């Protein structure tokens, strides 16, 4: 009996350790899941000149996280263009209940000084028609980047 409990405890601990070693799902993975794929496609299909890295699945991404914004739960995350993250970033928000998605594309020109003071050179593009509250939230996410000056 004691041996069975010990084995069960070891198996449980091993299972938790294996789960802890698995990488967290990324925002890029979240938007390709069947639950969110239609919202993502709807959001970018209404736009013109969507950057190739954003329209394809060729992007670098952070793990998504669940956040409360004014009492509602959202999935939030970040993606960027491979090998050019500093100049091409996308911050996104998924509202799972309303089946909506919003995003902010931040790009920097190839101008001397742009990487040293990105806030002076950056251009912003909104996806999904976010309201002012959501735009402010997305801007706040960008300001948390330690390289954003």
Question: What is each model feature region?
Answer:
Residues 20-38, 110-149:
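C-terminal partner/receptor-binding element of secreted or periplasmic proteins
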Residues 76-82, 104-105:
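Short beta-strand segments that buttress and anchor functional surface loops
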Residues 2-13:
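Bacterial N-terminal signal peptides
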Residues 97-114:
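Intrinsically disordered, low-complexity regulatory segments enriched in Ser/Thr/Pro
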Residues 67-70, 94-99:
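A short, structured loop/turn motif at beta-sheet edges
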Residues 18-78, 146-148:
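N-terminal secretory signal peptides
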Residues 84-91:
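Short, surface-exposed coil-to-beta transition loops
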């Amino acid at each position: 009996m004691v041996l069975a409990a010990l084995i069960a405890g070891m198996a449980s601990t091993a299972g938790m350790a294996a789960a802890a070693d698995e990488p967290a799902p990324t925002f890029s993975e979240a938007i390709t899941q069947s639950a969110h794929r239609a919202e993502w496609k709807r959001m970018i299909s209404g736009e013109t000149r969507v950057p190739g890295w954003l329209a394809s699945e060729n992007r670098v991404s952070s793990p998504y996280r669940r956040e409360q914004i004014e009492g509602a739960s959202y999935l939030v995350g970040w993606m960027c263009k491979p090998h050019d993250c500093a100049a091409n970033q996308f911050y996104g928000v998924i509202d799972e209940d309303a089946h909506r998605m919003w995003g902010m594309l931040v790009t920097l020109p190839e101008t001397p000084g742009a990487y040293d003071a990105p806030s002076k050179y950056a251009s912003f593009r909104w996806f999904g028609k976010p309201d002012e509250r959501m735009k402010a939230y997305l801007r706040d996410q960008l300001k948390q980047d330690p390289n954003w000056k």
